[in-house]
Structures are given as structure tokens and as C-alpha cells.
Amino acid sequence: MVNVEDRLYEGIAQQAGIAGCTLVDARMVRTGRAVALQVFIEKDETTAVTIEDCAAVSRQLSLWLDVENPIHGAYRLEVSSPGLDRPLKNLHDFERFKGSQAEIHLHGLTQGRRRLQGELLGVEDQKIVLKNAEGRWTFALDDIHKARLVPQW
């Protein structure tokens, strides 16, 4: 997967906002010869994303993408909610989902570990705090390659 360039990401966030939603994540995904721009949105912390929200963001983004033309070549636009295993992208996300189970992949090794799973304890002194059976872990946001919620069934 290729991360969407910052300029494109900011434009997508702005267009999602115009349509009444917040951008959670955006990425370019290549499968064989096909390329998709995947956009994940949310409404707010208490309102679920509807198909109408996805359609509104898709329409707004399509207009903007046609005018700005930031992506060269053919691609498919996909707009959806982030799902139960949503990515955690910023300190606000880690604080918001305090008490939830999360999986964190680090850029490098921390005490011999690159991947950790446990309960999010939130953010303390600009550091993300996670607790699992092995103990309490703290990370700077820059140490994290990717993180996501782990749904509990």
C-alpha cells in the first residue's frame, strides 16, 4: 500500500468536511493492475456513518478530484466507514478509544517486540499508553507504524 500524499490527504479531509464528515484515513491500494483510492470517514463520536454520508462524500470528492486532478491514471474511488477495526491515527483517537483493545505495530523493536496488543489506557504526556499481560507500554506517536482497534466479540 502507498500512503496518499499529504496534499491529497488534506484535500480529501477538506472535501469530507464540506460533506459533513471527518476523514479517518485515506490510502491508495493497488491490486494487480487496478488502483483504488480508499477513503474512510466518520460523522462524530456518537453518530454512525450512513450510506447517504458515504454517497455525499463520494460526490463531493469526485467533483474535487475531477477539477484538481491530483491522481494520474485510472483509479476507483471507494468511500466507507472505518469499520470496527478502525485505524488509530492521532493522539485524539488513542484518547477517545481509551479502554478499548488495540493492536499497535511499531517502526522498530521495543523490548524485543514490534507488535503489541492490549488495552488502551489513553494518552499521558503526549505518549500513548497500552497495558497487556506483559505490563504497561508507552510510545510516542512517531514510534507507531500503524495501529487499529481490535473488536471484542
Curated annotation (Swiss-Prot):
One Gene Ontology term from the biological process aspect of the record: translation
Classification via Gene3D superfamilies: Ribosome maturation factor RimP, C-terminal domain, RimP-like superfamily, N-terminal
Annotated compartments: Cytoplasm
Keyword Cytoplasm: yes
The keyword Cytoplasm is assigned to this record: yes
Superkingdom of source: Bacteria
Keywords: Cytoplasm, Ribosome biogenesis
InterPro entries: Ribosome_maturation_RimP (IPR003728), RimP_C (IPR028998), RimP_C_sf (IPR036847), RimP_N (IPR028989), RimP_N_sf (IPR035956)
GO annotation, cellular component aspect: cytosol
Free-text function comment from the UniProt entry: Required for maturation of 30S ribosomal subunits.
Similarity field: Belongs to the RimP family.
Name of this protein: Ribosome maturation factor RimP
Organism, as annotated: Acidithiobacillus ferrooxidans (strain ATCC 53993 / BNL-5-31) (Leptospirillum ferrooxidans (ATCC 53993))
